[in-house]
From Swiss-Prot:
GO BP: selenocysteine biosynthetic process; seryl-tRNA aminoacylation
This enzyme's EC code(s): 6.1.1.11
Taxonomic source organism: Pyrococcus horikoshii (strain ATCC 700860 / DSM 12428 / JCM 9974 / NBRC 100139 / OT-3)
Keyword Translocase assigned: no
The protein's name in its UniProt record: Serine--tRNA ligase
Record-linked PROSITE patterns: AA_TRNA_LIGASE_II (PS50862)
Locations listed in the record: Cytoplasm
GO cellular component terms, semicolon-separated: cytoplasm
Assembly and interaction partners: Homodimer. The tRNA molecule binds across the dimer.
Function (record text): Catalyzes the attachment of serine to tRNA(Ser). Is also able to aminoacylate tRNA(Sec) with serine, to form the misacylated tRNA L-seryl-tRNA(Sec), which will be further converted into selenocysteinyl-tRNA(Sec).
Gene3D superfamilies, sorted: Bira Bifunctional Protein, Domain 2, Serine-tRNA synthetase, tRNA binding domain
InterPro entries: aa-tRNA-synt_IIb (IPR002314), aa-tRNA-synth_II (IPR006195), aa-tRNA-synth_II/BPL/LPL (IPR045864), Ser-tRNA-ligase_type_1 (IPR002317), Ser-tRNA-synth_1_N (IPR015866), SerRS_1_N_sf (IPR042103), SerRS_core (IPR033729), tRNA-bd_arm (IPR010978)
Length: 455
């Protein structure tokens, strides 16, 4: 939620930012907010004036009664003032609701470094890492997407898609999951289950080493938490509701972690607060018909390890760089080639002031795919959830800044590992950093193994 003071003092900044985001219909909202706000403040002043007048009348009534003088006229006037105050308070309340309707639906103000663009095609790659394995049939596309800034190894054989590798390795059952639950669900099996759990523990250990507090949050939250954490559009496209309850299944641990300190004033000396959440995530994927319908890249449920930071406003941009670097280090240890992308205004979403994505190179698909998102939400969530801090008890509280980043979304990390570490026969090498968690160094095709999870 935006600060009403920003709209009062710099409405053109807000309008220009909406234009950059492509939110042209909402530009006129700024003038409507200013109009309503002026009316709201005028009525508040009138309420205060009437209260002052009523108090003066009350004093005068007291004086007259002591003298035995009549007070009927003053009492009548006082009653009229009380009635008028009540009417004005109702009007002020209605005006506030109208103002809040707009404020709660305006996106965050973007950082100056966010590129202006319409959609994901206008996102800007800012750095690359790793040596990619590229099938010769994908080389031209790879060179274009990597801008010639990545090392690569040419594969003469065509790498398989992760969904085919899962079948070869006996790692998933999609047909039975569809029977039981419908599309975009899956049973993970055998070594892939161990790999999923290994990724969670690996990411968790690395972030604990960096000072993050591990958290398993509630998997369901109340509506005020979702409204405070995300845009209203997500209620239609993303979030599952529990029928007849004020509870919603979390689409990410970010949301319960954001709500953790709702309506609190934090002690400034405790900032930054660093949390690493571990949870399942549940998503409708309502707006993605036809996209990634096979496999485990875009699904209704998956496990995720999430970084979440409460910081001082003046430190949040430094923390934004830190959390994306944390995620990069994880994928470097997993030996996954990737690029980091600065997300443009048209693809940014409402909550973030700036967002980086890590996109892993997928040899089977022949393109980069998103595996991490890291956002600085500045005070947008903190205002909605009323999360503030102060350094001294006599100091006026200020809103914190909140930041979040994927550490590991296990399903997408598994896709990246399968496609990047496959051999021609379908065997998949396990990154060395995971050996101590998996207990095995490779996964071989079903027909080549005697039992699951052999070392």
């Amino acid at each position: 939620m935006l600060d009403i003071k920003l709209i009062r003092e710099n409405p053109e900044l807000v309008k220009n930012d909406l234009i950059k985001r492509g939110e042209l219909e909402k530009v006129k909202w700024v003038d409507e907010i200013l109009k309503l706000d002026t009316e709201w403040r005028t009525k508040l002043k009138e309420i205060n004036r009437l209260r002052h007048e009523r108090n003066k009348i009350a004093v005068e009534i007291g004086k007259r009664r002591k003298k035995g003088e009549p007070v009927d006229e003053l009492l009548a006037k006082s009653r009229e003032i009380v009635k008028r105050i009540g009417e004005l308070e109702n009007e002020v309340e209605e005006l506030k609701k109208k103002i809040d309707y707009y404020l709660w639906r305006l996106p965050n103000i973007t950082h100056p470094s966010v590129p202006v663009g319409k959609d994901e095609n206008d996102n800007v790659p800012i750095r690359f890492w790793g040596k990619a394995r590229v099938w010769k049939g994908h080389l031209e596309r790879f060179l274009e997407q990597s801008q010639g800034k990545m090392e690569y190894e040419i594969l003469e054989w065509k790498p398989k898609l992760h969904v085919d590798l899962l079948e070869i390795l006996g790692g998933a059952d999609f047909a039975r999951a569809a029977k039981v639950s419908g599309s975009r669900f899956y049973y993970l099996l055998n070594e892939i289950v161990i790999l999923d759990l290994a990724l969670i523990r690996f990411a968790l250990d690395r972030l604990i080493e960096k000072g993050f507090t591990p958290v398993i949050p509630p998997y369901m939250v109340r509506r005020f938490v979702e409204e405070g954490s995300t845009s209203f559009e997500d209620f239609e496209d993303v979030i599952y509701k529990v029928e007849d309850e004020d509870l919603y299944l979390i689409p990410t641990a970010e949301h319960p972690l954001a709500g953790m300190h709702a309506n609190e004033i934090l002690d400034g000396k405790d900032l930054p607060l660093l949390y690493v959440g571990v949870s399942p995530c549940f998503r409708k994927e309502a707006g993605t018909a036809g996209k990634d319908t096979k496999g485990i890249f875009r699904v209704h449920q998956f496990h995720k390890v999430e970084q979440f930071v409460y910081s001082r406003p003046e430190e949040s941009w430094e923390w934004h760089e830190k959390i994306i670097r944390n995620a990069e280090e994880l994928f470097q240890e997993l030996e996954i080639p990737y690029r980091v992308v600065n997300i443009c205004t048209g693809d940014l979403g409402y909550v973030a002031a700036k967002k980086y994505d890590i996109e892993a190179w997928m040899p089977g698909q022949g393109k980069f795919r998103e595996v991490v998102s890291a956002s600085n939400c500045t005070d947008w969530q903190a205002r909605r959830l009323n999360i503030r801090f102060r350094d001294r008890t006599d100091e006026k509280p200020r809103y914190v800044h909140t930041l979040n980043s994927t550490a590991i979304a296990t399903s997408r990390a598994i896709v990246a590992i399968l496609e990047n570490h496959q051999e021609e026969d379908g065997t998949v090498r396990i990154p060395k950093v995971l050996w101590k968690y998996t207990g095995f160094k490779e996964i071989v095709p079903v027909e080549k193994k005697e039992r699951c999870c052999a070392t």
